Regions:
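Conserved helicase motor core of SF1/SF2 NTP-dependent helicases
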Residues: 1-190
């Protein structure tokens, strides 16, 4: 099973209809291959169990097993963040709409505070860590990158990216900036 492509704007292009635009490469190949050439992958090693479990339940009906133990997380990080996944609510930080995108200054403040905490912990432990700061909106990623560049994070190698541009990469620590926070329960395209 493969995660479906984002097809919110699927249109007919070059003679292909919307249904064909939604078809994944695996959807196309599997019926055309002999059974001996098809194998379902049931184990994942990249994500921590908290994130891997969420992905397994939401997309793979609980069939994807996590093989990366949470004990692999560095001790200096476990001391400050006892759980591998932390959600921080920012209900009083509404997003600001830009042309076709969004930013959220209050959430940027929270991300910077978390980075400073991680930098402090890594520095005290004399360790280095790679950190991905990921946002669903390009304007938020740009604003975060600009603010991060103004600070010093000597123990951290930080990459700021959108969800799409970070796909397939990995980091020791990931911070996801949801960006949208509103009382209308507007989810945006995420």
């Amino acid at each position: 099973k493969q995660l479906p492509p984002f097809d919110g704007d699927a249109v007919e292009v070059d003679g292909y209809g919307a249904d064909e635009a939604k078809e994944t490469l695996l959807d196309y190949l599997i019926p055309r291959l002999t059974p001996a050439c098809v194998e379902r992958l049931t184990h994942q090693h990249r994500m921590c169990a908290g994130i891997g479990g969420l992905i397994s339940r939401c997309f793979y009906f609980g069939t994807l097993e996590n093989k990366r133990p949470d004990s692999e997380r560095p001790e200096w990080l476990r001391k400050k963040f006892s759980k591998p996944v932390v959600w921080i609510d920012t209900p009083n930080s509404p997003q600001q709409r830009r042309i076709h995108t969004y930013t959220n200054a209050g959430e940027q403040d929270v991300v910077l505070a978390q980075l400073k905490t991680i930098q402090y912990c890594a520095s005290r432990a004399q360790q280095k860590a790679s950190v991905a700061v990921i946002a669903g909106y390009a304007a938020q990623a740009d604003a975060l990158n600009s603010r991060i560049q103004r600070d010093s994070f000597a123990s951290l190698s930080i990459e700021v990216a959108t969800v799409d541009s970070f796909q397939g990469k990995e980091a020791d620590i990931c911070i996801f900036s949801v960006t949208l926070s509103n009382s209308a329960d507007f989810l945006g395209f995420l």
